[in-house]
Amino acid sequence: MNKVNKINAYTCSSFQLHTIMKISFYVVERGFELAAFFTRRTIWIIISILLFLVAAYFILPVSLPLVAALLTALILTPAVNALQRKTKIKRNVAVMLVFTVFVVFIGLSGYYIATKAITQGTQIVENSPQYISDINRAWLNFQRNLEEKYENLPPELVQEINITVTNTLSDLRSNISDRNLIQDITSLISSIPGYLVTFLVYLIALFLFMLELPRLREKLYSYLSERTKEKVNFMTSRLSYVIWGFFKAQFLVSIIIFIVTLIGLLFIAPEVALLMAFIIWLIDFVPIIGSIVILAPWAIFQLIVGDVSTGSKLLILAAVLLIIRRTVEPKVMGKHIGLSPLATLIAMYLGLMLFGVIGFIIGPLLVIAFTSAKEAGIIKLNFKL
């Protein structure tokens, strides 16, 4: 019996020793693979990427005009190259022509929006007494209906409802009285020069970027070896394709939003359908806000004044636009920029949370830049766990 126990103990010890040796060999093997991966070059690349992300996190919020100008210049550069290739004119002339067309388009669009907004704002001010009358009438009808329902309710519940309604109205009245309308208007007017300066900086930076992009590219390539230059060429061509695909996809989604909004508003409010569809189309570019910021207050106002039909239709339209934006956008983006819908959605969300609204664009671009660098061999991730 003792001999059998000794044999079993020896067998267990041998098995445990064999298992420990296998685990040790596995750990050592994987350690060598990780050590081969973390070369000096790889470590410098990782440090550079981290420093770039940290710098972007602090610099991007205060340099949005310059970033927007650079992105716009990248978008307009193919038009400049095509014009220069077909007409055989100098690049300076081609840049001037494309820039002029772009500025004229922006100016005409801004003029149309401003005139329509002023016209509609004037009409709202002129009709404000009627709107106030409608709100008062709707409030009186609400009180009358509430009093009729009070008759069948317990006195304690009626008292609680009265207290709640009174407190709500008191809070609403105090919030309205606390708002200094003149101060808000003054603050808005005083901020206009700042916006104008930002817009001028954007236009000047756009023109200079369009002129200097080839020179900046040559300057960058002068610091690179031939092998690295080929990799960067592949990466930049891939990024150019992705940037164009991104804005093409965004434009396609916005066209769908504009068409659906215009068709819906032609049935709901035909007198302002075109203007409101255009405004909603512009605002829908902002991902965290979207069309709901226009349609929801409009619908609530219509419900308050008693126009339940119009208010309900506006809410339905807002829900339809939200569904279209959340379902169509990742698929279209993934098709045109080479990312899966899930990866596109994750990149957009993380970019939005880290960098704000501009991160909606930067998030997918960073993912594409990383995958392009990996495909070009600039970043090598060939280890397995």
UniProtKB/Swiss-Prot annotation:
Keywords tagged on the record: Cell membrane, Membrane, Transmembrane, Transmembrane helix, Transport
UniProt xrefs under PANTHER family: TRANSMEMBRANE PROTEIN (PTHR21716), TRANSPORT PROTEIN YTVI-RELATED (PTHR21716:SF68)
Family: Belongs to the autoinducer-2 exporter (AI-2E) (TC 2.A.86) family.
Subcellular location(s) per record: Cell membrane
Transmembrane segments: 42-62, 63-83, 93-113, 191-211, 255-275, 276-296, 304-324, 350-370
This protein's name: Putative transport protein BpOF4_00890
InterPro entries the record matches: AI-2E-like, YtvI-like
Membrane topology classification: Multi-pass membrane protein
Primary site of residence: membrane
GO cellular component term, pick one: plasma membrane
Pfam family, one: AI-2E_transport
Record GO biological process: transmembrane transport
